[in-house]
Amino acid sequence: MPLTLTLPDWVASVAHPGMVVAEDDDRMRLAIRLARENVRHDTGGPFGAAVFERHTGRVVGLGVNGVLRLNSSLVHAEVMALADAQSRLGSFTLAAEGMPAHDLFSSCAPCAMCLGATMWSGVKRLVCAAAQEDAEALGFDEGPVFAESYAHLVRRGIEVIPELLRDEARAVFALYRERGGPIYNG
């Protein structure tokens, strides 16, 4: 039986691979919008992510949290966005020879699992909105993530930009709490 990972149908009405988003703030707003719509549609946790070609702003991968919808603890927004991008580009790495630099924008700082996926994905930049403590304040367990975790990414050539539009992402967490969204790993 094949393993199939799918995004909710509503994602196509928000964004699609190939669209261009020029500015970092707008790229992050897309990741945050994916998180917000995931909450509004009751299709998962309050997390969204997108992979972009750095210099063109072309979307190459989209992701939302699908842990509950797909019954898998592995299906976090960052992992989905990275898998979508790699699948579309036909490469296990986004740093293959001849490929442009790719950036991962995430509505929240990655958990331990997603940090590992980011490290091995081939992205050259990680941009986050909400901070680890924001997710933990909501009740999520982010696992063993330390300052050294991010220093390791930097040593591997991945630029890390934290807390871009943090308050906008925190508003999605507030919406999730308001709606009684489940904390599935706390």
Feature-to-residue mapping (PLM):
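Zinc-dependent deaminase
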Residues: 1-38, 117, 121-186
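Short cysteine clusters
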Residues: 111-114
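Short beta-strand scaffold segments in enzyme catalytic cores
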Residues: 47-53, 57
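A short, polar/charged loop-to-alpha-helix boundary motif
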Residues: 66-80
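A structural microfeature
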Residues: 60-61
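Immediate flanking context of iron-sulfur cluster ligation sites
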Residues: 95-108
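Short, solvent-exposed cationic patches
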Residues: 76-94
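Short loop/turn motifs at secondary-structure junctions and domain boundaries
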Residues: 40-44
